[in-house]
Amino acid sequence: VDLLEQHAFGNYRQLLEAVTLSPAMGVYLAMRGNQKEDTKTGRVPDENYAREVMQLFSIGLVQLNADGAPKLGSDGKPLETYTQAQITELARVFTGWDYDGASSTDPAYVKKPMVNNPARFATGAKKVLDADIPATADGAAAMKTAMDTLANHPNVGPFLGRQLIQRLVTSHPSPAYVARVAGVWADNGAGVRGDLKAVVRAVLLDSEARSAATAPSAGKLREPVQRLLQWGRSFGAASPTGLWNIGDTTNPATRLGQSPLRSPSVFNFFRPGYVPPGSTLGTNAITAPEFQLCNESTAAGYLNFLQTAIASGIGEVKASYTAELALATDAPALVADLALRLSGGGISAETQATIATAVATINAGTDAGKANRVYAAILMLMASPEYLIQK
């Protein structure tokens, strides 16, 4: 997470290498301590990271056009981006990497980029996709070629650009939107490839992001964790100890059905190409990744968990509603203020009026009554479809 924050608006090539040499990633995907092949014992390099860095972090499974559409072969099927043999070759580049100065007295090594141990690095020539690495190249040189090759692959822009659009703006971006973002990925206007700041700017300022989102496929479902984070930020949630100990919020029946840093696998909480089956979205082949987290249990679990969090906090983490309590005697004003803060104008006047009518039924003649009005207004707004679907 620290690396992602550090490189979020930097260059993708640098981010890719930082993630690759991160001890945390090295442990997670078995690259740390990976050793060269041994013909006597039959040992071969671990292929886990070699597979995932291509499938998930850079080029994806199939070759893409600039607009994100798969390239098709003569048989009409998508063309694969890489083969098993190419995974095996890349895994040889990822040998010999380990902690930089592991020490029982100095824990700083767990944050330093991994370094290469020549004794464990695979010997001989190597190949990364179409790039040749000579037998004379050491671990650092081979890594540079691998990172350069992956970062410069034409798939990276449309593959990752589309996912950035999905996370920031809409689950089902048009091919033209993807192509425009991929174009900025390829060249930020100053000849620089992979400028993430420029790419994010292109995503957020694109005409499809700024225009009225009236199409049925527009927008995205807010992830449960993002809803919780917005509640905390909007209402000044604080942790007296500084530990922010909210526990595991994975349970779908009683909590969020999602928990920070606890995705069930390297494939994260949901697939970028997920299409909800048995739904109007599914009938129209509209991707909606976050809906993969949704079912009957999560719908009820989210509301029950949120109700408790709003009123009582989550353990030591509690919000403050001083400004909202000052508006509690005026239900329409309270709801309008909260709606603007939570949705940025995305909740209609009709929905606000309905919620305000319900809030007004709560007696505001006491401090407890005022607090209950605030709690109820926040809960109903954050439960409304117009809030849950961000447009």
Over which residues does each language-model region extend?
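Active-site substrate-binding loop specific to GH73 endo-beta-N-acetylglucosaminidase modules
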Residues: 1-247, 388-391
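Flexible, low-complexity segments enriched for small/polar residues
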Residues: 153, 157, 161-190, 201-391
